[in-house]
Amino acid sequence: MLGSCGILFTIIAYGALFYFGMFQRGGIYDKLRSQLAVTMLNSAVKEIEFYKLQHAHYPVSLREAEPKDKMQMNSFIDPTFIQHKGTSDGRFYYEVDPSGSFYYLRSVGPDGIPFTGDDILPTLTEDERKNTGLRLQR
């Protein structure tokens, strides 16, 4: 009886942690996901720029620049991603300008629409950003 109660408590506790960490919106977990998104966006900029050095052009999509080694961390997955109608895979929003000379990169935020007030952007300094093709606004 006591063992069964312990197992039940463990299942409930881990289930609650999983729910609050993965699905609940609002509160401290959203803030943590937003902070992680900024860190990952900053890493993604570096990976995109490295891709350009190797291939002489920006990747057409983030999938094209993903690490080939599956053991390597993928910086293009948005930790704040919420499934929206019409969205596909949980990656950051990425768009290369038709000229191929610059790109837009961001987390689209809770509304799922790019270039709105809830978007999360990379936090590069002006000096860091001027050496990249990253544009923050259209």
Indicate where each model-derived feature is located.
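Low-complexity, acidic interaction segments enriched in glycine
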Residues: 35-138
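Amphipathic alpha-helical segments typified by the pilin-like N-terminal helix
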Residues: 1-39
